[in-house]
Structures are given as C-alpha cells and as structure tokens.
C-alpha cells in the first residue's frame, strides 16, 4: 500500500484554510482534512468548498462524531467528504450506524482513537464492525 500524506486544516477561517490547502497540494499532499475547528466555524460548507477546489483529492471531514452517527455521516457525504471521522469513544451502535451510512453513501469511515482508554481493543472491535480506517491521533492540548 502506498503511503498517503494528509494535511489537517484546523483553522477557523476558510480563507486561511484554502491558502494552506493549496500550498499542501502543491507540495504533494494526497488527503485534505476539514478539521473540527474549521467545520465548527464554517459548517459543512468547508467540505463543499474543498471538494469543489480539489475534486481529485480525498477530502476528510473530521466530524468527531459521538452520537447521531447516521445523520452526521450522511451530512458529511452530501457535502462531498470521501472520509468522515467517528470517535472511538462513541457507542458500538453509533459506530455501526456510521459504517452503514458509509456503505450507503459510498465513503469511508475513519475511527479516531484519541484519548480512548483501551485503543487496541477498540481498534480490533472497529475492524470487526467494518470501520475502514483506524486513526491514531495525539491531542494537541
């Protein structure tokens, strides 16, 4: 499997995120992440704009979903996300709903292990439930 380089756009302003995204793409990045701060500030329009600007790239929506899995994943998919993120701390039913939404809408589901007390066990469970990508994320705070 070929390694993929991802840039996380953890900004509050879309204009700043686009500058960094363009520079990252020029530098060879493969995946562009609409970070949680950007989505909270700009809404899913951030994903729509990234999809429009970079139609050939993988667009990740770092939703950090904890509940309402199907609804949040559907929203990300309709905005143009290639990958949407659910937290490992979410319930099994929420994670399974995210996976089902991913299958229905044709995108991948990434589970973020950030701060989970038993990340190895949860990663194994997630694979059994059909999660596509396991993310190992260290918090910045």
Could you say what each language-model-derived stretch is?
Residues 1-70, 126-129:
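Conserved N-terminal beta1-alpha1 strand-loop-helix module at the mouth
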Residues 68-141:
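Conserved anion-binding
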């Amino acid at each position: 499997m070929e390694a993929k380089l991802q840039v996380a756009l953890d900004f509050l302003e879309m204009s700043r995120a686009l500058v960094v995204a363009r520079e990252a793409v020029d530098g060879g990045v493969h995946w562009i992440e609409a970070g949680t701060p950007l989505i909270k500030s700009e809404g899913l329009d951030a994903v729509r704009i990234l999809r429009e600007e970079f139609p050939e790239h993988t667009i990740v929506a770092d939703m950090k979903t904890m509940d309402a899995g199907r609804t949040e994943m559907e929203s990300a998919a309709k905005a143009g996300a290639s990958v949407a993120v659910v937290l490992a701390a979410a319930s099994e039913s929420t994670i399974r709903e995210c996976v089902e939404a991913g299958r229905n809408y044709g995108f991948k589901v990434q589970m973020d292990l950030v701060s989970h007390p038993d990340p190895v066990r949860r990663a194994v469970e997630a694979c059994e439930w059909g999660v596509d990508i396991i993310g190992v994320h260290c918090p910045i705070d």
